[in-house]
Amino acid sequence: MSATHPTRLGTRTKESNACASQGLVRKPPWANEGEGFELHFWRKICRNCNVVKKSMTVLLSNEEDRKVGRLFEDTKYTTLIAKLKSDGIPMYKRNVMILTNPVAAKKNVSINTVTYEWAPPVQNQALARQYMQMLPKEKQPVAGSEGAQYRKKQLAKQLPAHDQDPSKCHELSPKEVKEMEQFVKKYKSEALGVGDVKFPSEMNAQGDKVHNCGNRHAPAAVASKDKSAESKKTQYSCYCCKHTTNEGEPAIYAERAGYDKLWHPACFICSTCGELLVDMIYFWKNGKLYCGRHYCDSEKPRCAGCDELIFSNEYTQAENQNWHLKHFCCFDCDHILAGKIYVMVTDKPVCKPCYVKNHAVVCQGCHNAIDPEVQRVTYNNFSWHASTECFLCSCCSKCLIGQKFMPVEGMVFCSVECKRMMS
């Protein structure tokens, strides 16, 4: 792949900018009524408020389940999905756990229940319940709670649909579609996994069973002695925090990492963003756990404009980020900026004409917009052209460049006398 480098002007400004004037207007189910939501046709943001879709997204449950179902399709985790008879689309079979208050229900008193929108897919409900209690309270996916909202946001952030489904991407070429399909197939076979919740003692017992099967001719007394000594020495430490796990507490295992490693439930996190791996879905690479987004980021450049992975041979690098050539464009007019001069406005690239028209500061002297390539003097929220025609004493018109001055509400004075004369 090769990259081009456009030219940035160093002008800084605090003004906000409007969304691009183009775009398909379609209001998705997660947009609130009355907000004037308009979806930009490839930026995945609102054209009116510039809020990124991934931070606004609250997908419907069936949309979430379709996305995760597609992720698990053609993997060893097909037991976690079911295909609808109507369209054959794989759906994620989330394990929903409902707990009833153990206190005996009294007459005319409703039974108190707690519903977890997701729980580890284990048969032992006590194990699942213990796992949930080891998570931070604000991250427990109890229906209607902050934790449930956290899970939904992480589903959107960690597992973007456009990282696995070419149809969710913007105008991929046939070659790019094929390359993306191969990329997805590769990470499904080499990196994707789902954590297992187990008791460390249970895993150790399984290891002992395998060990004893391999030494079936050893004397029983010796085998018993060795097992006792090994049990006393066994300590289970978390692969993330290195602290030991307490006896009787569940841990998470990742098959890709090997069952000699385990994690506390709250430590099963992405090594890049530090967030809990949503629904224990992980990607394993070079001894580290990743969420889907950051695993893909470690393999492919991601466009800062559309948030999609870049499969084309050429792309642009600017502002320490990568961009599709067609997506590094003015945030106001959508004109491509590759090889052109631009100005960053609230972390968004804007072409010079749009900057002058929509965002440039106004000179207090001549009341014209200040060109981004022209030097200026700024004090608090006021600016002047750094010229002998504009940066003058508001009373006697003395040039103040390189001189001391007294600012007063958009005016500048060369002396106390001039200030008094204008007061």
Swiss-Prot record:
Query: What species is this protein from?
Result: Mus musculus
Which part of the chain is the LIM zinc-binding domain? 236-299, 301-361, 364-423
The subunit field of the Swiss-Prot or TrEMBL record says: Interacts via LIM domain 1 with ZYX. Interacts (via LIM domain 3) with ENAH and VASP. Interacts with ALKBH4, talin, actin, alpha-actinin, GRIP1 and PXN. Interacts (via LIM domain 2) with ACTL7A (via N-terminus). Heterodimer with ACTL7A; the heterodimer interacts with ENAH to form a heterotrimer.
Family that this chain belongs to: Belongs to the prickle / espinas / testin family.
Q: Where is the PET domain?
A: 97-204
- Domain note: The N-terminal and the C-terminal halves of the protein can associate with each other, thereby hindering interactions with ZYX.
What this protein is called in its record is: Testin
Region annotated Disordered sits at 1-21, 138-169
